[in-house]
Amino acid sequence: MSDTILNPYFGEFGGMYVPEILVPVLQQLEKAFVEARNDPDFQQEFQDLLKNYAGRPTALTLCRNLTKGTKTKLYLKREDLLHGGAHKTNQVLGQILLAKRMGKTRIIAETGAGQHGVATALACAMLDMPCRVYMGSKDVERQSPNVFRMRLMGTEVVPVEKGSCSLKDACCEAMRDWSANYENTHYLLGTAAGPHPFPTIVREFQKMIGEETKRQILEKEGCLPDAVIAAVGGGSNAIGMFTDFIDETNVRLIGVEPAGKGIETGEHGAPLKHGKTGIYFGMKSPIMQTEDGQIEESYSISAGLDFPSVGPQHAYLNSIGRAEYPSITDDEALAAFKELAKHEGIIPALESSHALAQALKMIKSNPEKEQLLVVNLSGRGDKDIFTVDKILRAKGEL
């Protein structure tokens, strides 16, 4: 491992497993990040953009109807209200400011559900940076509203036709582009995964989610929640929620992986509980692998959770037992999607619906239990309405 300023590992997970040509690029990024973190002017500009462009702080909303007949209080951290429609905007603004600080003149990114792509596109438009987004052709098809949004904001969207035509293939293409153009290009990675220092940078630019939640819940309830719950694909919204609660040992941290069509079918995206540790996407972390070590196809109804690995800090939190990682099926997520829309007037992203489904499962399993739960509603479901409409019609539920 080359010299780094910050620890590149979380326990045994993480690291910087990249072609030698990219090591100095990552070291430059780490140095710029450490300097920016200690620069009041950078922090002031970042905070100003979060407040006056993105719309922070986001609300913490008490569910009025979902918990009727139970003794649970359920709050939603409303990242769906952020400009761009999801938590992704937070760290995108931070990374583009970093890229400008390093003198980069071009941004590339990968996207699955399109939320990271939209966040990157809107921030690049506002901060005047050319932008290219790689997206699996399967995701281009199922997330057409977000593709249109990106193109409308001047971003070049490149459909990736290789492999499973999904997020992991978009990540590989973005990495290839970066390897060829690193001198003028910043790869704006969209989740808390990948080679060091990305997991740390993304966490630091997302941790205001948990910081705000802690302040807001103390103000509203006078105590900390019993559990905070977030969906986990790569893991950025969850680590953003968890970070400020890690040392609060009475607060359960629950990250929800996608069980897809059922763990037993093999069609899922739950590497933490059903994968094996290996090297993938520049890091050491749990991966869905075949017996001979090939990367297995992940699957989820939610494009943003359709990823065969997971961020290294989540792997570490799982290994030491600090966080729990249950999984939720497509059907359970769809049911939660419908319930929130019907009873609270909020349409969640399918990603967030997994976290909500876990909360509902906890509530329904013990309605008499007094508990205070917070779900990170990481994004809104506008992008998913066509997918859900098609599924519900096929099931005869509409």
From Swiss-Prot:
GO MF = tryptophan synthase activity
**A Pfam family of this chain:** PALP
Q: Which CDD domains match?
A: Trp-synth_B
The modified positions for N6-(pyridoxal phosphate)lysine read: K88
Q: Which cofactor does it need?
A: pyridoxal 5'-phosphate
The record's comment on protein family reads: Belongs to the TrpB family.
Q: Which gene specifies this protein's sequence?
A: trpB
Reported function: The beta subunit is responsible for the synthesis of L-tryptophan from indole and L-serine.
What binding partners and quaternary form does the record give?
Answer: Tetramer of two alpha and two beta chains.
Keyword list, A-Z: Amino-acid biosynthesis, Aromatic amino acid biosynthesis, Lyase, Pyridoxal phosphate, Tryptophan biosynthesis
> Pathway it acts in?
Amino-acid biosynthesis; L-tryptophan biosynthesis; L-tryptophan from chorismate: step 5/5
- Protein species of origin: Actinobacillus succinogenes (strain ATCC 55618 / DSM 22257 / CCUG 43843 / 130Z)
Q: State the reactions this protein catalyses.
A: (1S,2R)-1-C-(indol-3-yl)glycerol 3-phosphate + L-serine = D-glyceraldehyde 3-phosphate + L-tryptophan + H2O
Q: Which HAMAP family match?
A: Trp_synth_beta
Its EC number(s): 4.2.1.20
> Matching SUPFAM superfamilies, A to Z?
Tryptophan synthase beta subunit-like PLP-dependent enzymes
Q: What is this protein called?
A: Tryptophan synthase beta chain
Q: Which domain of life is it from?
A: Bacteria
